[in-house]
């Protein structure tokens, strides 16, 4: 059996370890992106969100990184259009151009 090194190194990371707030008020875009970048640099893994409301603008998923929204977790898109990035007038909450082995899963909700 052949298992890739990335699969062996994949780890779960609690969003709160990166200073990501679940209060529904704090704009978490930079903290979430830093978490994704960190997990990517470590070879991949899953960023796990637990009960709460997580306000964010656009974040870019990277290869081998996934997001898990557990039951009661809500990823809330900020109402400000200026907090979103995109090309050619297209803006999105989660951007993943050219990335592999990514995903968003769980029983939580994406609002926005």
Regions found by a protein language model. Name each.
Residues 1-112:
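Extracellular/periplasmic carbohydrate-active domains that bind, remodel
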């Amino acid at each position: 059996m052949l298992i890739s090194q990335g699969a062996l190194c994949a780890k779960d990371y609690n969003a709160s370890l990166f200073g990501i707030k679940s209060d529904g008020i704090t704009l978490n875009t930079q903290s979430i992106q830093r978490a994704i970048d960190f997990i990517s640099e470590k070879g991949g893994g899953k960023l796990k969100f637990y009960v709460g409301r997580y306000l964010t603008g656009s974040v870019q998923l990277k290869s081998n990184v996934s997001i898990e929204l557990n039951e009661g977790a809500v990823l809330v898109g900020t109402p400000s259009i200026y907090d979103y990035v995109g090309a050619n007038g297209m803006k999105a909450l989660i951007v993943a151009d050219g990335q592999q082995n990514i995903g968003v899963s769980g029983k939580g909700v994406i609002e926005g």
